[in-house]
């Protein structure tokens, strides 16, 4: 399932999800969290999202989810690279952090293709993660 490598379980109801998305509003409004919709060029359907969290820091965090029927086509790589390139120029961070589930080989490849190296690890209730540091792509 698409939520297998998300850090949290999806809310069980629309009411529960309302609580979750409402907590996202303040960081979106103050510009510290940015979210980009990944759309198909042919028909503009939503393929996923890329998040840039702690965007105003020297090392913002990248995150991504791509719908299952669109995975395996390089869309995640293209989307993360596009956001990292834009942010490298527009926000001028030193680097990006990209936490990835240890078993999420496809997402690990995204980081590695962008010059990312493992700098740490994290544990959460669903899985263990490695944290990649991706350099500013404009330097």
Stretches found by the model and what they are:
Residues 1-5, 35-139:
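Acyl-donor (CoA/ACP) binding surface of acyl/acetyltransferases
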Residues 3-23, 34-36:
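Conserved GNAT-fold acetyl-CoA-binding loop/helix
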Residues 10-13, 27, 72, 100:
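Alpha-helix initiation/capping motif
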Residues 23-26, 119-120:
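Short, P/G- and charge-enriched loop/turn segments at secondary-structure junctions
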Residues 26-32:
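Short loop/turn motifs at secondary-structure junctions and domain boundaries
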């Amino acid at each position: 399932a698409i939520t297998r490598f998300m850090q949290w379980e999806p809310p069980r109801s629309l009411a529960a999800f309302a609580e979750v998305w409402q907590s996202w509003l303040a960081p979106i409004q103050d510009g510290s969290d940015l979210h980009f919709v990944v759309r198909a060029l042919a028909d503009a359907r939503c393929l996923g999202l890329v998040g840039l969290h702690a965007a105003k820091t020297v090392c913002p965090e990248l995150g991504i989810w791509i719908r299952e029927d669109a995975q395996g086509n390089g869309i995640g790589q293209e989307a993360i690279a596009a956001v990292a390139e834009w942010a490298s120029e527009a926000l001028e961070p030193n680097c990006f952090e990209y936490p990835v589930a240890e078993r999420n080989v496809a997402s690990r490849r995204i980081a590695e293709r962008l010059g990312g190296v493992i700098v740490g690890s994290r544990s959460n209730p669903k899985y263990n993660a490695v944290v990649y540091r991706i350099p500013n792509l404009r330097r």
